[in-house]
Regions:
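Electropositive, gly/pro-rich neighborhoods at or near active sites that engage anionic ligands
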Residues: 1-76, 85-86
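Short, basic, glycine/proline-bearing loop/turn elements
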Residues: 44-53, 101-104, 126-127, 150
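Active-site regions of enzymes building and remodeling cell-envelope glycoconjugates
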Residues: 89-94, 149, 172-175
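Long, charge-patterned amphipathic alpha-helical coiled-coil/hairpin "stalk" segments used as oligomerization
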Residues: 110-164
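C-terminal functional extensions of proteins
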Residues: 159-209
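Glycine-rich, small/polar surface segments that engage phosphate groups of diverse ligands
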Residues: 74-115
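Buried hydrophobic positions in well-ordered alpha/beta secondary-structure cores of metabolic enzymes
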Residues: 78, 152-153, 191
Length: 209
């Protein structure tokens, strides 16, 4: 076994042990399948059991997101930190592109909002959006009418994050969010990875736990 394979095996063992500890401390068996997978993944990534009651999951919408991913829906993220946390799937992230900076200046909008406009222009309707950092990205998704296939809306912060997530839930768009100011790149990526594992398992390309 190569050193790379050793490291991968060690990472798998650590993750399995992490989930074992998690399940010994909280019972989420009351939740439906995809809601449970997402909630466990977020708690495992954050070591924060409050997410068991903070996340707002819609099982039917989560199932549709899994189906969309299995069908090859494009994935757009709001920040490089979110992209870095996603494994096994190509993602579109426009935040650091020069065109994003120019659009931000000329339109007088945040870079996150400009990145949403450019991402939508490239991917079109039906994409899976993953927002873990910028409330303004979530606000732009709602105001631009991007017709998402699904939105993971978990931006973090005391300024505008909870309000943006409230607006996402009020919009009726298929989504996953949380009630509090908590969130962030790691938990948004963890939620997405849980859905991706299910999609890969459904497509017969791996995944599952």
């Amino acid at each position: 076994m190569s050193s790379g394979e050793d490291l991968a095996a060690d990472a798998d063992r650590l993750e399995e042990e992490s989930y074992r500890i998690l399940r010994s401390r909280i019972d989420l068996s009351r939740l439906a399948r995809f809601s449970r997978d997402v909630t466990e993944s977020v708690i495992q990534a954050s070591a924060d059991f409050d997410y068991a009651t903070d996340l707002v999951c819609d099982e039917e919408a989560l199932a549709e997101a899994v189906g969309a991913l299995a069908g090859g829906a494009p994935v757009i993220v709001d920040a490089a930190m979110v992209a870095a946390g996603i494994t096994g799937c190509p993602v579109l992230c426009k935040i650091d592109e020069p065109l994003t900076q120019r659009l931000s200046r000329t339109a007088g909008i945040s870079r996150a909002a400009a990145a949403v406009r450019l991402g939508f222009g490239q991917a079109g309707p039906g994409a899976i959006w993953v927002v873990g950092c910028a409330p303004s990205a979530l606000q732009e998704i709602l105001s631009r009418g991007v017709e998402p296939g699904f939105v993971i809306g978990l931006p973090v912060g005391f300024v505008g994050a909870a309000e943006a997530k409230d607006a996402l839930r009020a919009s009726g768009l298929p989504s996953l969010s949380n009630v509090s100011e908590k969130g962030g790149a790691a938990v948004a990526a963890a939620a997405f990875n849980a859905l991706l594992r299910s999609a890969m398992a459904a497509a017969g390309t791996g995944g599952g736990r």
